[in-house]
Amino acid sequence: MIAYTTYLTDARVRREAETIASLPDYRVSVFVLKEHAEANTYILDGVEVVELNVAKYRGKNTMKYLVSYIVFLMHAFLKCTGKYMSNTLDLVHVHNMPNFLVFAAIIPRLFGIKVILDIHDILIETYASKFNGFSNRLFKYGLHVEEWICCKLASRIICTNHLQYQTLVDRGIAVKKLMVLMNLPDPAKFCMNGEKRNPMNQRGFRLVYFGTITKRLGIDLAIRAVNEIRAKIPGLQFYIYGSGEDRDEFLELSRQLNLDAIVHFSEHAVPLEEIISIVKSMDLVIVPNRKNVATEQMLPVKMLEGLALGIPVVVPRLKPIEYYFTGEQVFFFEPENVQSLAMTIAQAYQDKIGRDDKMKNAKKFFEKYAWETHKLDLIGLYRSLSTEKRPPLRKLLP
């Protein structure tokens, strides 16, 4: 697998890698970004994690993002080609962003190795929101070409939800290449295990956001909403876990609003096992996404993870969320409306019975879209691509 991510914090990459590594006839190596100053290689839950000597760029400069991607691509290309040359490669699974990481597998692909492109986020819409639209028509056209070429190069393409699937179909991507593998929490990790939580009145009311700290995902809206209701909810606390390009700006916003004693930021991204333990201790998960072309294609995984852990969620009325959920399962607010978000948090605080009812109803989602079913789909995809015969490298070389 190849992914421009830090392995310990990426639930989807870990879940898929661990699923395949659990099969007796598969060995999985994952090429990812380094977590610290030095790149390490280690084994975790049966997966060989190979950190490449590239750190994640967190900023707003388009060219610096592109350079970081290209440097990672070059490192991944060398590793992937090396595995193929040593006859230890049978299948390549590439996670976007960006899509062009599939070119790390260009040599194996030319010699018949199958390549899976796992589209977490559609690049065109994500970049339009990240960089405030496209001022450069050539850049926008380039992204469309990049998506088309990479999808042509891939043997199969994984989408994370049905709206994303339809968008790619509308753009002319062959239906036979596409499949939906939703970003569902692994019940082996994301479950309450019958744990009893402390009564709310013993520790105040605790809100949590966990994920990328960026303005396009609305964390500033959540901070302002907390400021609106700070006097209405005794013991209100808001915890923000993650990293991102706008963290310093949101820290300053919190200080300006005199929320230092209420809003708390983690120093860095938190490993998956630690974040699970943290979220279990919370009363409400906040998903404050803004409304834009990217979030209208996105089913927030943090919402699903919170629900899987038995924690009610507050979410914006966006197409992908309303496609899968109703007001009987989650607390909805109007997107980009601070007052609506504040009122919804206050409503959730006051309505303990409502919180419990929504959690009971949310179980219907996981009954319909069970990870165990998607897990079998993923394994089936791997087996179908792995069984196709190809000549060994030694017969192809002169």
Language-model features: locations:
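N-terminal subdomain of nucleotide-sugar transferases
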Residues: M1-E48, L397-P398
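Acidic anion/phosphate-binding donor-loop and adjacent secondary structure
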Residues: V169, V175-K176, L184-R203, G218, ...
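Membrane-proximal helix-turn-helix segments that form the acceptor-binding/catalytic region
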Residues: T81, I107-F111, L123, R137-I157
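Nucleotide-activated donor-binding/catalytic signature segment of Leloir-type glycosyltransferases, i.e.
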Residues: Y241, D248-I276
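Conserved acidic donor-binding segment of nucleotide-sugar-dependent glycosyltransferases
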Residues: G327-V338, Q347-K352
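Conserved donor-binding/catalytic core segment of Leloir-type glycosyltransferases
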Residues: I158, P199-L217, A222-V226, Y239
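Nucleotide-sugar-dependent
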Residues: A11, L217, S266, P271-I278, ...
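Carbohydrate-associated surface elements
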Residues: K34, L163, L184, A269
